[in-house]
């Protein structure tokens, strides 16, 4: 009551925001005669004028009024449509990076042209996001007339385009497309092996049409690209035949503490002979080498009935801490398949995640995000919390005169359907068009059968019958028309009233059930009463409806009994309407928590995804990877020194054999240190010696085939390793996510555990990338002409597309020119810090 009184005196926040735009609207209107007086060529030339103003230091705000006035005039000349004042306000709301709630028929599509043109003047591209290919294509052709008139280019992203077509569309000033296509293109770009093949530009500015549908309704379903983990299981069987021939010590050595196993030189020869391979470490045989290593682990490090059991033809992991079986969990990186080959059971192909992202995290990448919809105000808190978007309700151009009648409630669904059919028949006889909204395909088909029996002609629009959607919706306003539609069908297409329909009361909306969300109900109502047209709406409900049955509970039934309802008799009561609204509020709160929950988990993956994608882009940048490789070699040699060298004992007493074994396992080299040096060497100096030895070997390998070819190989090996281990990490994170809910039984917070263990797994993957990259580069040998190396690229994988924190700035490793500075030595830059904490970080 007090709030209402204050609102009357001071106005609501929304009314104050709208009022603040009025002076700008007035200025745009004052500019109208100036632009009307221009010739077509003069008007078109304004685009270059605006671009020059921006180049000279003006801001978008400085040129907003002129740009909007130019778009308005171009629209009049091309489409014969003039932007209303309220549409100018909508354009300003979008430009500011907020959500404009505009009722159906208020021209959201036309509104988007204003901020799209203005922001495209920067040359960085604008993405206009729609819910389906039809709307993306329609809006490109329709609104594209305005942009092209003003000298702008327009592109469309729809399903079925090849990369060249996509690249061309993204390079346009303004690009229309669906949310799915934009998201999948981002994921696909980050799986490519050349920057020249990327299709997307920066994520600069996005205008999301039907923003509630895309950012809220679809937020619970991530975009996923998946593919078979292995194309064939045959290689596992072939390798498994060879491994049992190997003998410990002669052919391989085991480090039980580190749980690693390494082939000896003799072992490599046996494997090469058994598989008919000339050189196991040739770059062509990297996949075979990976299978050999996994099979070797399966046979030597993993024991049946200790690490796993075989039950009903399946290899089931045993939890090492609890001893419990973990059905459904699988080792990653091909190890599980190697165990299946070892145990002679069926090798299962895994369809694993190759890349995924939620819409929440995709759209939060844009520097500026905005949206339009007819219904957003009910979800305003969620838009603010998740996306930092304010919702501004734009006034209608003409007063809304639609009559929204109270709900009528029946005891059973059958009684409700009978009443609905009677109402439709009566409206059809009078000639008033009716749009019947259902919440399921099943309901729409049930009503269609009942109407057919009564002989009432009608159209049905649902997911099974979506061909000609736009035509069916467009005809729904003709006299005598009966259209049965699922609630979300036909969004984006206006229902225009046919001749004589206004006199009959306009389009009548008949809802057959309340949706879980008030917003969806409002969308259905909003199909009627556009642009000041007459119209009406009413919902028919029953106690059998899911919403009332599940969330209304016994209380609603008791109220019905108290009111003394007879069979077939409807009831209208405010207390029931309040009960329905309370039920909807409960569901909306529950769904919000679900979406927030998904986002909290995906935020963990998002931070990791950003690191990997940034690393891939650095690899593909064309800059030399030599400094990165040197830093990896340094870390690994220092690690070996740290494990085996202790300054508390004399260097002669260090385990030199173990040092050499580790150097051989990682680099394929052995280090000879004179006794004279051993008398005075310290652990840090050992790290320097190991590093220098490794670098000399690395330089020799590079020299043998030439620097340019070696750079190509470095890029190939790093990409292949990052992609392979990232793919396996995604699978491991999927498994962790699936089982994390059970941690609550152990009095643990699942999200906290997921963050902690996910970070540990990610750190392990980063370490493994370093080890694998260096090992492959040191062990690779060439039997063919070196110039063929540049042709090597990882194989494209079969892919399936399903709709299902602060970034640290990475310093580039310092490239050494003179003698190496010890990691613990003072930094030569003079900061006073240790080198590893300063320039060597």
Curated annotation (Swiss-Prot):
One of its GO terms (cellular component) is cytosol. Zn(2+) binds at residues 827, 829, 838-839. Its EC number is 7.4.2.8. GO terms for biological process: intracellular protein transmembrane transport; protein import; protein targeting; protein transport by the Sec complex. It is a peripheral membrane protein. May bind 1 zinc ion per subunit. Keywords: ATP-binding, Cell inner membrane, Cell membrane, Cytoplasm, Membrane, Metal-binding, Nucleotide-binding, Protein transport, Translocase, Translocation, Transport, Zinc. ATP binds at residues 87, 105-109, 494. Residues 518-538, 796-832 are annotated as: Disordered. Monomer and homodimer. Part of the essential Sec protein translocation apparatus which comprises SecA, SecYEG and auxiliary proteins SecDF-YajC and YidC. Part of the Sec protein translocase complex. Interacts with the SecYEG preprotein conducting channel. Has a central role in coupling the hydrolysis of ATP to the transfer of proteins into and across the cell membrane, serving as an ATP-driven molecular motor driving the stepwise translocation of polypeptide chains across the membrane. This is Protein translocase subunit SecA.
């Amino acid at each position: 009551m007090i709030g209402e009184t204050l609102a009357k005196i001071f106005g609501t926040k929304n009314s104050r925001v709208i009022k603040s735009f009025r002076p700008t609207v007035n200025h745009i209107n004052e500019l109208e005669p100036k632009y009307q007086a221009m010739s077509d060529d003069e008007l078109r030339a304004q685009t270059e004028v605006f671009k020059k103003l921006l180049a000279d230091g003006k801001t978008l705000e400085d040129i907003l009024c002129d740009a909007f006035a130019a778009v308005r005039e171009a629209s009049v000349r091309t489409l014969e449509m003039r932007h209303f004042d309220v549409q100018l306000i909508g354009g300003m709301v979008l430009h500011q990076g907020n959500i404009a709630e505009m009722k159906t028929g208020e021209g959201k599509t036309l509104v988007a042209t204003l901020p799209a043109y203005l922001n495209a003047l920067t040359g960085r591209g604008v993405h206009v996001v729609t819910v389906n290919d039809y709307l993306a294509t329609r809006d490109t052709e329709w609104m594209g007339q305005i942009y092209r008139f003003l000298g702008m280019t327009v592109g469309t992203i729809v399903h079925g385009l090849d990369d060249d077509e996509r690249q061309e569309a993204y390079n346009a000033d303004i690009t229309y497309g669906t949310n799915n296509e934009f998201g999948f293109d981002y994921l696909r770009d980050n799986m490519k092996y050349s920057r020249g093949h990327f299709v997307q530009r920066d994520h600069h500015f996005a205008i999301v049409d039907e923003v509630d549908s895309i950012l809220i309704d679809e937020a619970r379903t991530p975009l996923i690209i998946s593919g078979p983990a292995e194309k064939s299981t045959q290689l596992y069987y072939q390798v498994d035949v060879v491994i049992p021939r190997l003998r410990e010590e002669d052919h391989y050595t085991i480090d039980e503490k580190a749980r690693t196993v390494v082939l000896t030189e003799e072992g490599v020869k046996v494997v090469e002979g058994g598989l008919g391979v000339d050189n196991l470490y040739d770059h062509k045989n990297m996949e075979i080498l990976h299978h050999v290593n996994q099979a070797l682990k399966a046979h030597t490090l993993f024991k049946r009935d200790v690490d796993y059991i075989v039950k009903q033809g399946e290899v089931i992991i045993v939890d090492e801490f609890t001893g419990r079986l973990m059905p459904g969990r699988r080792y990653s990186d091909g190890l599980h398949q190697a165990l299946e080959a070892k145990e002679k059971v069926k090798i299962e192909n895994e369809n694993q995640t190759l890349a995924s992202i939620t819409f929440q995290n995709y759209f939060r990448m844009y520097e500026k995000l905005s949206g339009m919809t007819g219904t957003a105000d009910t979800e305003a808190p969620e838009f603010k919390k998740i996306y930092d978007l304010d919702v501004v309700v734009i006034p209608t151009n003409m007063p809304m005169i639609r009559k929204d009648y109270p709900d009528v409630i029946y005891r059973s669904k059958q009684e409700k359907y009978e009443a609905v059919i009677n109402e439709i028949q009566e409206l059809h006889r009078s000639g008033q068009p009716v749009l019947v909204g259902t919440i399921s395909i099943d309901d729409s088909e049930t009503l269609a059968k009942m109407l057919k029996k009564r002989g009432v002609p009608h159209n049905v629009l649902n997911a099974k019958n979506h061909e000609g959607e736009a035509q069916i919706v467009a005809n729904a306003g003709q006299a005598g028309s009966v259209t049965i539609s699922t609630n979300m069908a036909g969004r984006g297409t206006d229902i225009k009233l046919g001749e004589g329909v206004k006199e009959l009361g306009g389009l009548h909306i008949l809802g057959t059930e309340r949706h879980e969300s008030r917003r969806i109900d409002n969308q259905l109502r909003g199909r009627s009463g556009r642009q000041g047209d007459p119209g009406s709406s009413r919902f028919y409900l029953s106690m059998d409806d899911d919403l009332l049955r599940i969330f209304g509970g016994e209380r609603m039934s008791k109220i019905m009994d108290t009111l003394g309802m007879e069979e077939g008799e409807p009831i209208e009561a405010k207390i029931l309407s309040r009960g329905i609204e309370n039920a909807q509020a409960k569901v909306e709160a529950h769904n919000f928590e679900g979406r927030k929950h998904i986002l909290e988990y995906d935020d963990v993956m998002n931070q990791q995804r950003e690191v990997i994608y940034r690393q891939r882009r650095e690899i593909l940048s064309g800059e030399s990877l030599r400094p990165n490789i040197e830093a990896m070699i340094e870390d690994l040699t220092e690690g070996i020194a740290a494990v085996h060298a202790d300054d508390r004992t004399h260097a002669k007493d260090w385990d030199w054999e173990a040092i050499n074994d580790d150097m051989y396992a990682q680099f394929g080299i052995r280090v000879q240190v004179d006794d004279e040096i051993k008398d005075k060497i310290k652990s840090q100096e050992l790290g320097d010696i190991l590093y220098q030895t490794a670098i000399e070997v690395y330089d020799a390998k590079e020299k043998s085939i030439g620097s340019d070819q070696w750079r190509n190989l470095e890029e190939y090996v790093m990409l292949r390793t990052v992609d392979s281990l990232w793919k396996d990490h995604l699978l491991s994170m999927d498994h962790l996510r699936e089982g994390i809910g059970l941690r609550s039984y152990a009095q643990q917070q699942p999200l906290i555990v997921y963050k902690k263990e996910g970070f540990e797994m990610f750190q392990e993957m980063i370490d493994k990338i370093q080890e694998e990259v260096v090992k492959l580069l040191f062990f690779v040998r060439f039997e063919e002409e070196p110039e063929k190396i540049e042709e090597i690229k990882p194989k494209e994988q079969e892919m399936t597309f399903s709709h299902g924190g602060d970034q640290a700035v990475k310093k580039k490793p310092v490239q050494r020119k003179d003698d190496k500075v010890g990691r613990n030595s003072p930094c030569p830059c003079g900061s006073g810090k240790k080198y590893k904490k300063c320039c060597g970080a």
